[in-house]
Amino acid sequence: MAAHKRLQKEITDMLKTPPSWCSAHLVDDNLQKWKATVQGPEGSPFEKGVFSMDIDIPADYPFKPPTLKFTTKIYHPNIKTSDGAICAEVFSTWSPQLKILDVLTTIRSILTDPNPDNPLETEIAQQFKTDRNAFNKTAKEWTKKYAK
C-alpha cells in the first residue's frame, strides 16, 4: 500500500508541476505503467527532439528500479537501437530514495553527456569517441526524422 501511495504522489506531482523539459502520464490508469516524454537538451544533437518512452514500475518499487525504454528511435551509445533499452548508472546504483523524475533527469543528462565506456551500441560508442562530428550529424538526422 505504501508503494501505491508513493506512486500516486509521484504522478500527481508530475502532473501538477511538470518540469519544462518532460511530461508523464499513466497508461490506462495503471500506476505501474507510465508514458513519458523528454525534450532533447539544448546544445546537444538531440535538441528540438521530443523522445517518448515507456515506464514499467515493478510491484516492489521503490526497492527495485523502474524499467524505461525509448519508444522513439534515437542514435545514442547508451540506448539500444532495436528496442530502446537504456544503460544508465541510475539503474545499477538504485536506492529507494530515488523517484521516477530522478530517472528521467538522469536519462536527459545522458543525452547531453553519453557514456561511451558503458555502451549498449558499441559501434555508435566507437564513433562517438573517434569521430564526434559524424556522431553528431547522424544523431541530429535521427532526431529530425524520428523525434518530432
Curated annotation (Swiss-Prot):
UniProt KW Transferase keyword = yes
GO MF terms held by the record: ubiquitin conjugating enzyme activity; ubiquitin-protein transferase activity
Pfam families, per database record: UQ_con (PF00179)
**Effect of inactivating the gene:** The developmental pattern of protein ubiquitination is altered in null cells. Null cells are blocked in the ability to properly execute the developmental transition that occurs between the induction of postaggregative gene expression during mound formation and the induction of cell-type differentiation and subsequent morphogenesis. Null cells plated on agar form mounds with normal kinetics; however, they remain at this stage for 10 hours before forming multiple tips and fingers that then arrest.
Q: Which InterPro entries match?
A: UBQ-conjugat_E2_core, UBQ-conjugating_enzyme/RWD
Which SMART domains does the record cross-reference, listed alphabetically?
Answer: UBCc
State the EC number(s).
2.3.2.23
Residues covered by the UBC core domain: 2-148
Note the SUPFAM superfamilies from the entry.
UBC-like
Family listed: Belongs to the ubiquitin-conjugating enzyme family.
User: What name is this protein filed under?
Assistant: Ubiquitin conjugating enzyme E2 B
Origin organism of this chain?
Dictyostelium discoideum
